[in-house]
């Protein structure tokens, strides 16, 4: 019941007694009522909960269904912009990147791709320097990782669940990486 509520599968059961999806979830799944009286008490007790935030909805849909809700993150303007680039063979989804395709690269030989960061992990090298290990997805729900070397965690911020266009280095052995996060990552929208 919990997963069905958080993934939106029970949205058609929400009526005017509930102030939102989070209120509905709390009243029926968080503290499951045994009788109709208990349901009425839960509805009253959790009334201030309202709705899930956009970030919570994205998180639940991605984690519970296994499909990232790109339509909640990429608006029509960004979608059109990406489509026009992709019509010319440029800026593919990160999971569609082909190292042999010349149009997928900029003048410096870097891979130009778009993606949506899902999680940013701060890690340390053997010498104690911080770097990001960024878990990303795209419209294909393809999961990839990007290593961002030489970062300053106070200055170099990556917003999760926001679309980015980036020029990245690519190695078949190591995958995607960058050494200049502030210069290579461009947030879209």
Please place each PLM-identified region on the residue numbering.
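Sliding clamp-binding short linear motifs
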Residues: 1-105, 147, 175-189
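Short, charged beta-turn/beta-strand-edge "cap" motif at the junction between a beta-strand
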Residues: 168-174
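Short nucleic-acid-contacting surface segments enriched for D/E, G, S/T with interspersed K/R
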Residues: 151-167
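Structured catalytic/nucleic-acid-binding cores of DNA maintenance enzymes
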Residues: 1-9, 134-142, 164-168
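A residue-level signal for conserved active-site and pocket-lining positions in enzyme catalytic cores
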Residues: 65, 115, 161, 168
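OB-fold (S1/OB) nucleic-acid-binding surfaces
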Residues: 118, 122-150
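Hydrophobic core residues within well-ordered beta-strands of beta-rich domains
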Residues: 111-113, 132, 164
